[in-house]
């Protein structure tokens, strides 16, 4: 049987009322990922609501796979496009959000920044105060604080994320993201620091205090791992798999092999 014939046969099973049969067919269809879109487009308006539902499920799986690969690709790129990575990170967690809508929030933020002089740390602090941004400590308990769209809507976000966003729209250069005594800061060329968790105060590094410098790749990896930890905290297998695959750059379930039961079904539950 030709590949197209095999795919058509599998699609013919999507109306089967036996869930096991349909799930098996869907699993096989996902092996033909590159050929699926044209078939899904043809079946998404099928008269049978059961077929439409299962076609939608397949479309969601393909979308999630693309999102994971896209984030992984961006993370491994020699040059990291910050707005694109912020958008990709947001969509890993809020995967029902629409990309253009979230992207528009960033464009509005960048446009607002263009109305302010952002040539000094004082300018940056003033801008963030005027925008009513509230920086929060780094935490795995509030995953939304690492999601650009939610942060821009609610004006509350992880200090690290706010600094990465601010540095991207600032005209002051160079600006370095760093961590000092556990808190994220921005450092200008003269060595002064912008401290978001200290009400956007400006200070200098004291003698003996070592500033740990962070590049974009390190930040986005850190943020994605925090989202992964949030998924574990909430016992959300779907997001555990999504974040693990995005960080690992693969679609397989093998990324869960290092995790304990029940996330890795191959490991039996052991007694305490």
Q: Whereabouts are the PLM-identified features?
A:
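A structural boundary/capping signal
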Residues: 2-272
